[in-house]
Amino acid sequence: GVVREGDFLLHEDGSYSLSNGDEDVLEVIDGSEMLITRSLQNWHTHLPMTLNRSMGEGMALMDWLQTSIFPSERNLTPELASIGTRASVAEMISGGTTFACDMYHFPSAIAPIVADSGIRGIVCGPTTDWPPAEEGEEDSGNAIRELESMIRSGPLGSGRVEIGIATHAVYTCSEEVLRKASEMSRELGARLHIHTSETREEVAQCHEKTGMYPIEYLDSIDYFTEGTVCAHCGWVTKKEMRILARNDSHAVHCPVSNQKLACGGTMSYPAMIEAGVDVRLGTDGAASNNGLDMRAEAKTASLIQKHDHWDATILNPLETWQLATKGSSDWVTWDLTDIRMRPRGRGSRRVLSNLIYSGTSCLDVFVDGIAIRRSGKTLTLNEERVSLDLEEAAQDYYSEI
């Protein structure tokens, strides 16, 4: 089976080994009723957008953005971004997620919170002002100067939190902005993060304007740098998949958000793997998910891939969990006494399937060998205070909408 039973030593560097029972250890944890796994990794999200959770329900993507999200974001301040981020991080830790690749405004407000929480992250900030310059006015350049300064200052949280560069999408960023971001990425060694081929409309508009599909277009302007994070990739040709593979890019599957916004296209996981693309999993923001539960995202990814390809063998439990935890060096323990984890089956052979498709409570979270959650309680954030702050902040955020 895929589950091993026994006594294990967890090492600070993220490795583990079998215990002989006589080692000098910092702490002994009774894991007899626990399942320990690698932690979940959220490769595309917008952390402050817990402020927008359940806002503008039942709208098409572009209508939702233009009438709900973008107008509210004009009220966004660094303080509000901090409050939303703190809530998102608390939610992720409570669900066993220890990494987030974020894309949003005010990275200088977001990154310290991610670092202080004890998790890992890539906090990607924009290169243009927010709110944007009025028509006819020039961008002040403040955003890109601040972002460059943050990148040059180096990672936060003992190296756990990097700063990256966000370019929203081909339909919101000019060629000049995209080229500048790519140059900055090469010069500073910072990660690029972009939405790609999320909707038919986006793809059709790009093709009409440039004669190319979005990923082809980005390749034609030499946008990609190593490790570029491409969110969604729901309407992608096989040629574009080969471009992603050639550029060592990550294609991030966000199935819950795509279904909720009726984007229509589902990333073809088998075709991506066949093309050699590195696929990751993400929730998108709480505005379009509406949660940040990566276990639920893994379940949804497995189900939609089986359904769309008429093939129940795609993304079996082990492959699904490997997709959701890819790159993790941290640990999470799960409650095996929860009724949702029964029956375990002979040799605990049903445990991983139960975890993915049924669920249970996250008990402990360890990052860099340090506990940030124990016995179901997060140690680095006051969840009750965070929750109340979010509720209060939302009232101000929507006051003029």
What is each residue range found by the language model?
Residues 1-24, 35:
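N-terminal metal-binding scaffold of metallo-dependent hydrolase/deaminase domains
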Residues 109-239:
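Metal-coordinating catalytic core of metallo-dependent amide/deamination hydrolases
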Residues 51-83, 122-140, 200-227, 247-250, ...:
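Active-site gating loops and adjacent loop-to-helix segments of metal-dependent hydrolytic enzymes
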Residues 85-92, 250, 258-263, 305-345, ...:
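C-terminal helical cap
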Residues 330-379, 383-387:
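C-terminal cap of metal-dependent C-N hydrolases
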Residues 192-199, 262-264, 271-297, 326-333:
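Short acidic/histidine-rich active-site segments
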Residues 53-119, 143-157, 391-399:
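Alpha-helical scaffold segments that flank or form the walls of functional sites
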